[in-house]
Amino acid sequence: MDTDHRPQAEGAVLTPSAEAPPVAAPRIDCRDIRVFYGADQAIHNVSLSFPDRAVTALIGPSGCGKSTFLRCLNRMNDTIENCRVEGQILMDGQDINDHSIDPVLLRSRVGMVFQKPNPFPKSIYDNIAYGPRIHGLASSREDLDAIVEKSLRRAGLWEEVKDRLQAPGTSLSGGQQQRLCIARAIAVRPEVILMDEPCSALDPVATARIEELIDELRKRYCIVIVTHSMQQAARVSQRTAFFHLGNLIEMGETEQIFTNPREKRTEDYITGRFG
């Protein structure tokens, strides 16, 4: 990435900005999303779209609803008792919350990488091969070997593990485990990759490696990342959405959000007046 043009997290002003340049057609289009935990409303009427081959960052203070919203995109909220999602989330024109949609197949199209690396208690090889096996993506051992190698290469891990594929996935370092989890998501041929604070448990060196990987993966996938780090959002994303108290306050090109926000609440958050 060209660091000379990297947006900064300080010095935001409130002068009107130009209209955001056009982006690719949305891979996912969210319309009037509302999320409830029992009687408590966590997300309020959020409409937001995510373009293909780009990184969109969701930022905001703790408890603002960004992770809850992220989980809507592959129906992970279905697994939470008393959680209810209303509104439409369209993928290829079809509402993913329709009862005809198999959530298991949906999650193969919309993969997820969690805050803490969570490799399966299996070998490095089987961590990657598990998904393609259950989804019938390989017709032979040779096909499976090819998927494993390609996924590990795309995650930047192949050269580090190619001679110990039968070692436990848990034997890897934290940063390697997170790249293994990214490779596992890639292996089932997703169209979208969701990342929920993927670097929060990693050291700076491992974080830099994951950020480089995200920049490479965006050439192939629609990526949505939740991050508590405004600096990380500025480094890795092309578009940024700012959430506060379950509301979408502002959405725009990352450079505009960080240097010329339209909303005062966005400026106050970016400049550290609250957080």
UniProtKB/Swiss-Prot annotation:
Chemical reaction(s) catalysed: phosphate(out) + ATP + H2O = ADP + 2 phosphate(in) + H(+)
Family annotation (CDD domains): ABC_PstB_phosphate_transporter
Gene: pstB
UniProt entry tagged with the keyword Glycoprotein: no
Gene Ontology CC: plasma membrane
GO molecular function: ATP binding; ATP hydrolysis activity; ATPase-coupled phosphate ion transmembrane transporter activity
Keyword annotations: ATP-binding, Cell inner membrane, Cell membrane, Membrane, Nucleotide-binding, Phosphate transport, Translocase, Transport
UniProt name for this protein: Phosphate import ATP-binding protein PstB
Membrane topology: Peripheral membrane protein
